[in-house]
A protein has these predicted regions:
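Specific transmembrane alpha-helix
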Residues: 121-124, 133-156, 201-213
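Cytoplasmic-side transmembrane-helix entry/capping segments in multi-pass membrane proteins
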Residues: 112-117, 138-142, 163-171
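Hydrophobic membrane-targeting alpha-helices
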Residues: 45, 101, 124, 128, ...
Length: 265
């Protein structure tokens, strides 16, 4: 197990805040969020201008399909596709506003892992609870980043300036979008397609639990070590359960929230 080194003496609140602010770095640049956003725009342009038919998007080798779960890359690559420009713009806006600050402090590797695991958690969770749907969209990764902000505050609360405002801002964005997703799921459809709130929830759960494990902790205490183990155990148990579930219940098993056609998330 890799141990994270910590300072021998605890920081005072003023020093801790300065220390955390000093962690923001543009060198190396936060390339993961930028590269991911550019890739998503390029994929949207390709499927909009080159192959504009929605049937082509549904037949894309990148989309998550329950009948193609043996093609494991689909659990990740569906996050590069979007059903419309509003869907794309919202996801990119949130992941840039939320992801870049995290990447500047914690580095591209940690944030890249969090984002991709959020995407995977979105499709794995959907495969269990909404087992008969197709998926496009990066909201699993976006919600992993939102929840990672909560993990970041829990880890470094005493070292931050205005941590409560950070939580309020993240909670506002998450609850607003999540409320729309749940409403849309039961009452309407965006772009003629239903929104999968399961992928939002499972992406957020992955971001919170894994974020508490891999994000940098500048204020380590005994209770943080206990929280670290609880988070690691929860994350591992959820991932193992969904993988085993998929192995034991191949398509066309119908999950708790049955649906059809394509969902955006």
């Amino acid at each position: 197990m890799i141990k994270i080194s910590i300072d021998e003496f605890p920081l005072t609140e003023e020093k801790g805040q300065k220390n955390y602010l000093d962690r923001y770095r543009c060198c190396p640049p936060p390339l993961f969020i930028i590269f991911t956003s550019i890739l998503q725009v390029m994929m949207f342009v390709y499927y909009t201008l080159v192959v504009p038919s929605s049937e082509d998007l549904l037949s894309s080798p990148l989309i998550y399909r329950p009948d193609k779960r043996s093609e494991l890359w689909r659990f990740v690559t569906y996050g590069t596709l979007h059903a419309g420009w509003i869907h794309l713009a919202f996801n990119i806006l949130v992941q840039v506003l939320v992801g870049l600050p995290l990447e500047m402090v914690h580095g591209s590797l940690r944030i890249g892992i969090l984002y991709l695991v959020g995407i995977i958690a979105g499709s794995l969770g959907t495969s269990v609870f909404d087992a008969d749907v197709y998926l496009v969209g990066a909201s699993g990764g976006v919600y992993a980043l939102l929840a990672a902000h909560l993990a970041n505050v829990l880890n470094n609360y005493s070292n931050m300036q205005f941590p409560s405002l950070r939580l309020l801002a993240v909670a506002f964005v998450a609850t607003t979008d999540m409320g729309f997703a749940v409403y849309d799921y039961f009452n309407g459809m965006m772009f003629g397609l239903p929104v999968s709130y399961i992928a939002h929830l499972t992406g957020a759960l992955a971001g919170l639990t894994l974020g508490l494990v891999i994000l940098k902790n500048f204020n380590q205490k005994i209770q943080h070590h206990l929280l670290w183990w609880i988070s690691l155990g929860t994350f591992t148990a959820c991932i193992v359960f969904t993988i085993i579930f998929n192995i034991l219940h191949p398509f066309p098993y119908l999950g708790i929230g049955q649906a059809s056609n394509m969902f955006v998330q």
